[in-house]
Design a protein with these regions (language model features):
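A conserved beta-strand-to-alpha-helix junction within the catalytic ATP-binding
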Residues: 13-27, 86
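Conserved catalytic submotifs in the C-terminal HATPase_c
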Residues: 35, 40-50
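Short beta-strand/loop element within the Bergerat-fold HATPase_c
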Residues: 77-89
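Short alpha-helical Gxxx[C/S/T] motif in the catalytic ATP-binding
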Residues: 125, 129
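Detector for a conserved hydrophobic position within an alpha-helical segment of the HATPase_c
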Residues: 133-134
Length: 178
């Protein structure tokens, strides 16, 4: 049931949410795996609190998949950094690990359904991440070097697509009256 819910697209329930709350709750869900490998999760938040217009449950699913991949990739007694911040147009979150990394020839395929390099798993985790982030008007970037680690960056618009459209229409209306 949880598996089918994860792969079947649902309409996001958009609300203004604190991105850090979503990430911290996801980290708590992964606590057993983190403790089993003695991994230190280090949160690095920017000065301003990043808010996202999004569906908290869907975003938790995205971070659950990304953080799970990082946990799988790193050796015992290592660290995973989760960095959040805001730039001019976007709220971003990065999950940084120094694990096994992704081979250069595999990088173009990570969002494809059923693509996996793991012995276990279904190869749909990053496909789901990509879909969720895209449904939120954002994008996912992956920077990885084999045997050196991976940085997964999620970027979300600071304003929802609907809000940007309204603002754009208001600006056009102002230009027409002058």
């Amino acid at each position: 049931s949880h598996f089918l819910k994860a792969i079947r697209p649902t309409t996001p329930d958009f609300k203004k949410i604190k991105l850090l709350d979503v990430i911290e709750e996801t980290v708590r869900l992964k606590e057993r795996e983190v403790n089993a490998k003695n991994i230190n999760i280090r949160m690095e938040a920017g000065v301003r609190e990043p808010f996202v217009n999004g569906d908290a449950e869907q975003l938790k699913q995205a971070f659950f998949n990304i953080i799970g991949n990082a946990i799988d990739a790193v050796p015992e007694n290592s660290e995973i950094r989760i960095i959040t911040g805001i730039d001019s147009d976007h709220v971003f979150a990065q999950v940084v690990d120094q694990g096994t990394g992704i081979r250069k020839e595999d990088l173009p395929h990570v969002f494809e359904p059923y693509f996996t390099t793991k012995k276990e798993g279904h190869g749909i985790g990053m496909m789901i991440v990509h879909r969720i982030v895209r449904d939120h008007g954002g994008d996912v970037g992956i920077d990885s070097k084999q045997d050196a680690g991976t940085i997964v960056t999620l970027r979300f618009p600071r304003k929802s697509p609907r809000h940007r459209l309204l603002e754009s229409n208001e600006l056009q209306g102002e230009n027409q009256t002058k």
